[in-house]
């Protein structure tokens, strides 16, 4: 039974899931808006919003924590210096999910996830 299970497995092993979320979050930070499946977008939302909250502290420990999660110097720099300062006054809700279409190959619902 799946009762009260805390996250989506997305049909992947734990390491594959971690790599997927890391790569999706780097793409979202670099481009501001990406298209993915609704399930991945919902899981990515919680991952990215936690990173933005940590990056908003804007000290060296925040920088280290974000880099530990992303492993990308460019994305870390952009998140800490450009994106997070815009959301300092905001208490969560940094992303928006918009359902777009049904994918032709497997009829999966697709969605845009973007930074507000």
From Swiss-Prot:
Gene Ontology terms: cellular component: cytosolic large ribosomal subunit
GO molecular function terms noted in the UniProt entry: structural constituent of ribosome
Record-linked SUPFAM superfamilies: Prokaryotic ribosomal protein L17
Gene3D superfamilies for the chain: Ribosomal protein L17
Key words of the record: Ribonucleoprotein, Ribosomal protein
Keyword Ribonucleoprotein: yes
Pfam families the record matches: Ribosomal_L17 (PF01196)
Gene Ontology biological process terms, A to Z: translation
InterPro entries the UniProt entry points to: Ribosomal_bL17 (IPR000456), Ribosomal_bL17_sf (IPR036373)
Recorded superkingdom: Bacteria
Subunit (UniProt): Part of the 50S ribosomal subunit. Contacts protein L32.
Family classification: Belongs to the bacterial ribosomal protein bL17 family.
Protein name: Large ribosomal subunit protein bL17
Gene designation per UniProt: rplQ
């Amino acid at each position: 039974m799946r009762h009260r299970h805390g996250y989506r497995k997305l049909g992947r092993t734990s390491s594959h899931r971690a790599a997927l979320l890391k790569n999706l979050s780097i793409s979202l930070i670099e481009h501001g808006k990406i298209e993915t499946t609704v399930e991945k977008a919902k899981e990515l939302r919680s991952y990215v919003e936690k990173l933005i909250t940590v990056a908003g502290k804007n000290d060296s420990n925040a920088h280290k924590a974000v880099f530990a999660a992303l492993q990308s110097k460019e994305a870390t720099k952009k998140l800490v210096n450009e994106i997070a300062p815009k959301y300092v006054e905001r208490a969560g809700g940094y992303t928006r999910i918009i359902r777009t279409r049904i994918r032709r190959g497997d009829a999966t619902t697709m969605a845009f996830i973007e930074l507000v």
